[in-house]
C-alpha cells in the first residue's frame, strides 16, 4: 500500500493550482508547470490541497498513485522555489565558462566542448571549477546536469572530471611495482 500517495499535497502560499480532468496546472512566482496524471489515478482539488487516489487496486495503479502525487508536489516546489544542481570540475586545466547562453567546457580534449543551454534552464558559472544548473522543472534540471557530467565523468584513479557537488568518488589504487 502506498504511504506516499495517501498524503494530500498542500498548495503552497503564492501558488495557484487548478485541476482539469487528469491535468494539474500550477502557477507561481517562478513560472507555470503542468502534469498530466495517468488514467489509473484520479486527481481532485479539495480544501486547497490536491488529492490523488487510485481508481482500482491493481499493482500498476498503486505504483502510479505514489508517483503521481510526488510529481504534483514537484511542480508546486518548482514554480515556488525552483530547483538547482551544482557540479564541480576537478583536474589540471579543466574549467568552465559561459559564452553567451552556451556553456564552454575545457575538459582535456583537443577541442572545447560547447553545451547549448535548453529553453527553461539557467546555467551559471560562479567559479571556473563550479557550474550551477537551475530551473523550475526538476526532471529537466537533473537531465541537463547529467548531460554535462557525461562529457567527462569522474575517473576513479585521480578523481579528475565533472562530478555533482557532494558526490563521493570511490577511488582505486594504482598499479604497484
From Swiss-Prot:
Q: How does it assemble?
A: Part of the 50S ribosomal subunit.
State one molecular function term (GO): rRNA binding
Query: What name does the UniProt record give this protein?
Result: Large ribosomal subunit protein uL6
Please state which protein family the record places this protein in: Belongs to the universal ribosomal protein uL6 family.
Q: GO terms for CC?
A: cytosolic large ribosomal subunit
Q: Which NCBIfam families is this protein grouped with?
A: L6_bact
The record ties this protein, via InterPro entries, to: Ribosomal_uL6-like, Ribosomal_uL6-like_a/b-dom_sf, Ribosomal_uL6_a/b-dom, Ribosomal_uL6_bac-type, Ribosomal_uL6_CS
Which UniProt keywords are present, listed alphabetically?
Answer: Ribonucleoprotein, Ribosomal protein, RNA-binding, rRNA-binding
GO BP annotations of the record are: cytoplasmic translation
Q: What is the lineage of its organism?
A: Bacteria, Pseudomonadati, Pseudomonadota, Alphaproteobacteria, Hyphomicrobiales
Quote the function comment for this protein: This protein binds to the 23S rRNA, and is important in its secondary structure. It is located near the subunit interface in the base of the L7/L12 stalk, and near the tRNA binding site of the peptidyltransferase center.
Amino acid at each position: 500500500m502506498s504511504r506516499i500517495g495517501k498524503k494530500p499535497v498542500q498548495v503552497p502560499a503564492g501558488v495557484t493550482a487548478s485541476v482539469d480532468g487528469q491535468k494539474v496546472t500550477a502557477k507561481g512566482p517562478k513560472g507555470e508547470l503542468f502534469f498530466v496524471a495517468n488514467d489509473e489515478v484520479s486527481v481532485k482539488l479539495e480544501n486547497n490541497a490536491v488529492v490523488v487516489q487510485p481508481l482500482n487496486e491493481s499493482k500498476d495503479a498503486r505504483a502510479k498513485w505514489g508517483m503521481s502525487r510526488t510529481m504534483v508536489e514537484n511542480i508546486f516546489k518548482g514554480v515556488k522555489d525552483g530547483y538547482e544542481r551544482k557540479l564541480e570540475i576537478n583536474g589540471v586545466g579543466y574549467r568552465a565558462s559561459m559564452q553567451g547562453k552556451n556553456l564552454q567546457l575545457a575538459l582535456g580534449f583537443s577541442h572545447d566542448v560547447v553545451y547549448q543551454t535548453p529553453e527553461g534552464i539557467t546555467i551559471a558559472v560562479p567559479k571556473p571549477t563550479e557550474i550551477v544548473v537551475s530551473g523550475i522543472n526538476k526532471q529537466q534540471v537533473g537531465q541537463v546536469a547529467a548531460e554535462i557530467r557525461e562529457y567527462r565523468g569522474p575517473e576513479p584513479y585521480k578523481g579528475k572530471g565533472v562530478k555533482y557537488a557532494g558526490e563521493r568518488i570511490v577511488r582505486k589504487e594504482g598499479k604497484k611495482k
